[in-house]
């Protein structure tokens, strides 16, 4: 039996804040998979959700060269926004459109082995 290489798509967080965009995108994915069945991995952003949550909590969000600088005390909020809110919004839409998603974060199941590239960016 031959395994298919999964199609990997990286989504920007703007997809989650633009009305109707996620519904439209997932609908397109569903139609694509009907015609071309294969494993699919969606990697999502959610910086807008992180920014909104930090602002609501009275915390500042600092960026350096367009990348978020994340102090240790903000990690629970960043994880909540990305692995919680963003992930579950995408899963709910996929389920509503008849797909069978599994939501994971990079911390699940030893999926990633990471090395900090620059300590100036904090804990992400």
Over which residues does each language-model region extend?
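Nucleotide/pyrophosphate-binding catalytic subdomain
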Residues: 1-124
């Amino acid at each position: 039996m031959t395994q298919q290489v999964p199609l990997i798509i990286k989504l920007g967080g703007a997809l989650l804040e633009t009305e109707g965009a996620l519904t439209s995108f997932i609908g397109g994915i569903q139609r694509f998979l009907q015609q071309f069945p294969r494993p699919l991995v969606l990697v999502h952003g959610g910086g807008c959700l992180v920014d909104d949550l930090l602002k609501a909590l009275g915390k500042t969000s600092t960026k350096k060269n367009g990348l978020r600088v994340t102090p240790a005390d903000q990690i629970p909020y960043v994880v909540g926004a990305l692995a919680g809110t963003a992930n579950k919004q995408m899963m709910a839409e996929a389920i509503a459109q008849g797909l069978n998603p599994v939501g994971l974060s990079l911390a699940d199941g030893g999926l990633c082995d990471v090395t900090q590239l620059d300590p100036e960016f904090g804990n992400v």
